[in-house]
């Protein structure tokens, strides 16, 4: 079959392209911007990429077009597909019909930690000899790709609540039919497609409804939003994580780089790994619980996490210059910002200076729906720098004024980088947070800090 994918350079759609290629299909695709690393990965798989959406790319006509959720009516390719009656479907629908139908699916859903937790679950199964398939919204550090078919019935998927396509506004995860389901947490997000928390809870409950009776749902007992969702009805086995639940994680070090796994009052494993932060400890515990459902002993799963490498942009060290370390993180919601800063504080200690640099870039952030929570979420930083995005209905100056620590802002990335470099002293830690490229600020900071060091040496 010849398959053409519209919007192929997103992590999810690129992952589907790799799976389709592995199944023996001829695969081509297009995107508005064909860019690395996805373009490089796809090129290696022998997948032809086309820049832009000129309708001529559909000649000769493919057997099937998979349409990404960024595509809208009016797109030349979308219009040609409809006009010529070319068979089409969404990415999640294709994944269900051609890959997941006969698999034991382990799905990881939730507002935060999906990529990390899915990566952990995949690595546990891999390290324990299960050779799982997977589709993850980032390239897990232990693998070179974001998706593969695998060689066993088990398939791990990052289950996103975003919608499927312009013709299917349900959350992607309703197509995945998991047997093992992790619900990490639930908060209001994606304000561009959800009106309120109840609308998200409704979609999450659709997911709960399709887990079989012999399936298992693993969720944190202290999450009130999930508790409300589960109260709408559950027909599957449940395992709760938390103080009053079946599973607990007990921290042995302040940065959570070492912790114990407890199940039903008994210690069943020890984790000593390269990650830090209680949020990662929580993610790891969820992954261990999910792996147990498919047959991995908790002690083996805990041991496997010792060699887990996270996906990029998860408290990733980008470099050091003039004695200042620069970290990058994908955090783009107050809860994630709070957790990431707490993790870094645990890592560097209570007296080291942390400088937080934030770009409010997600749709929810831009709409200002969580701006009142931003200043409190930045509380563990010693100094804050904020980028003012253009064309948003609120001012980051409001957040700067609400911060208890010194806080500054600029509408220009270069200016903001210069401000940070001027402030930063040897021994400081800079944490850059955004779900985008932030105008290449990481390298600008490292270059500026190196130049500052040279100037000091010159004197």
Role assignments for model-derived ranges:
Residues 1-34, 38, 43-49, 61, ...:
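ATP-dependent carboxylate-amine ligase
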Residues 4-5, 19, 91-140:
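Walker A (P-loop) phosphate-binding motif
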Residues 28-30, 129-136, 241, 408:
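Conserved RecA-like helicase motor-core motifs
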Residues 39-44, 57-67, 71-90, 96, ...:
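Acidic, Mg2+-coordinating active-site environments of NTP-dependent enzymes
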Residues 68, 107-109, 135-136, 156-158, ...:
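Short beta-strand segments
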Residues 149-151:
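Conserved motor-coupling elements within RecA-like helicase/translocase cores
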Residues 154-164, 326-332:
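Switch II (G3) loop of P-loop NTPases
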Residues 163-177, 335-343:
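Switch II of P-loop NTPase G domains
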